């Protein structure tokens, strides 16, 4: 079901859709590289999760990056268990459209992924990204430990200063533990590989994101 006007405030536990106990069916293998979306992942590899607007274009930005082993799109940082795409788009689940990134830290650092994240979209737009408006398009970095959070906060501070110098407003990116990651439907996985001419609303600010020496290798 779609609502004619999307709310721009997050739902409460009382107003959120109830969801379902079972996971939504999705693809088993990555459409581009045939690696397993849900694992097992190689020993020593790490995961990162980002939200930067419509996940179709966001996922492609990461799977094209050297050192990234597999990507998947899904929903997180919300309230409704096992939501569908239609439910997320209603604004009544509280989720973002996120990208799970599995990467080799010997090839690319977490800080470099955060840099790519910031440069790939406009993180100052609140509950929208370009023409895409709604709570599911908000910017987010979903960290799994204190070290990731510290790196994300440090890179955010550096980029916020760079953006301010170019006339942009404050960064609205949330940096939190996003809770469960619910894999999106098969149709959405690697969408722009399956549909090369498909919609991609991803667009950055044109401002380079600096990384301090202290966090560059993390």
Swiss-Prot record:
It is an enzyme of class 1 (oxidoreductase). Its EC number is 1.8.4.11. The active site is at 54. It holds the Pfam family PMSR. Keywords: Oxidoreductase. It comes from the Bacteria. One of its GO terms (biological process) is cellular response to oxidative stress. One of its GO terms (molecular function) is L-methionine-(S)-S-oxide reductase activity. InterPro entries: Met_Sox_Rdtase_MsrA_dom (IPR002569), Met_Sox_Rdtase_MsrA_sf (IPR036509), MsrA_MetSO_reductase (IPR050162). GO terms for cellular component: cytoplasm. It catalyses: L-methionyl-[protein] + [thioredoxin]-disulfide + H2O = L-methionyl-(S)-S-oxide-[protein] + [thioredoxin]-dithiol; [thioredoxin]-disulfide + L-methionine + H2O = L-methionine (S)-S-oxide + [thioredoxin]-dithiol. Belongs to the MsrA Met sulfoxide reductase family. Has an important function as a repair enzyme for proteins that have been inactivated by oxidation. Catalyzes the reversible oxidation-reduction of methionine sulfoxide in proteins to methionine. HAMAP family: MsrA (MF_01401). This is Peptide methionine sulfoxide reductase MsrA.
């Amino acid at each position: 079901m779609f609502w004619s006007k999307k709310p721009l405030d997050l739902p409460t536990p009382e107003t959120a859709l109830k969801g379902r106990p079972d996971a939504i069916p999705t693809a088993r293998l990555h459409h581009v590289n045939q690696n397993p979306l849900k694992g097992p992942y190689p020993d020593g590899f790490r995961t990162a999760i980002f939200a930067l607007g419509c996940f179709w274009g966001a996922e492609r930005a990461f799977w094209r990056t050297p050192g990234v082993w597999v990507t998947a799109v899904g929903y997180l940082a919300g309230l409704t268990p096992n939501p569908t795409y239609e439910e997320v788009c209603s604004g009544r689940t509280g989720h973002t459209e996120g990208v799970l990134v599995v990467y080799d830290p010997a090839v690319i650092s977490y800080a470099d992924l955060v840099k790519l994240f910031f440069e790939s979209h406009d993180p100052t737009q609140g509950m929208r990204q370009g023409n895409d408006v709604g709570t599911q398009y908000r910017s987010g970095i979903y960290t799994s430990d204190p070290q990731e959070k510290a790196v994300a906060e440090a890179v955010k501070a550096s980029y916020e200063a760079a953006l301010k110098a170019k006339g942009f407003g404050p960064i609205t990116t949330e940096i939190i533990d996003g809770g469960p990651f619910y894999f999106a439907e098969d149709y959405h996985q690697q969408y722009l590989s399956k549909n090369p001419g498909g919609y991609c609303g991803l667009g950055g600010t044109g401002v380079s994101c600096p990384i301090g020496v202290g966090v560059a290798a993390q």
